[in-house]
């Protein structure tokens, strides 16, 4: 279930991302920068913990966690959140909660690409990554 996600991925397309980060509450200037960045993502698993590293010319983030266990995360836009990542139906589902708000990040493999659907309230962004 985890194996298809493992490896390094690069962003190849992004739809509605600016509206999504606006819904998160990201200010105008950082939001515009976020939309220009083409990050790469590396996902690894050591049998107990999973690591997700996201990198770009502007910022690098890394999270290390056990599936199904809540953990604290500082996001790329500096939000301090409680995250929970689980696997459901072949998808990796991440729920971030902070200050009474919640966003869901759903990662799935479709035709060899990683499709990431980010949802906040009624705003959905779809980002597609291909394996490097």
From Swiss-Prot:
Q: Name one GO cellular component term.
A: cytoplasm
> Which Pfam family, giving just one, matches this sequence?
Lipocalin
Q: Keywords on this record?
A: Cytoplasm, Lipid-binding, Phosphoprotein, Transport
Single GO MF descriptor: lipid binding
Q: Does the keyword Phosphoprotein apply?
A: yes
Q: Where in the cell is it found?
A: Cytoplasm
In which tissues does this protein get expressed? Testis.
Per the record, residues carrying Phosphoserine are 13-14, 40, 42, 44, 91
Family statement: Belongs to the calycin superfamily. Fatty-acid binding protein (FABP) family.
Protein name (Swiss-Prot/TrEMBL):
Fatty acid-binding protein 9
Taxonomy, top ranks, is: Eukaryota, Metazoa, Chordata, Craniata, Vertebrata
Which gene is annotated as encoding this protein in its UniProt record? Fabp9
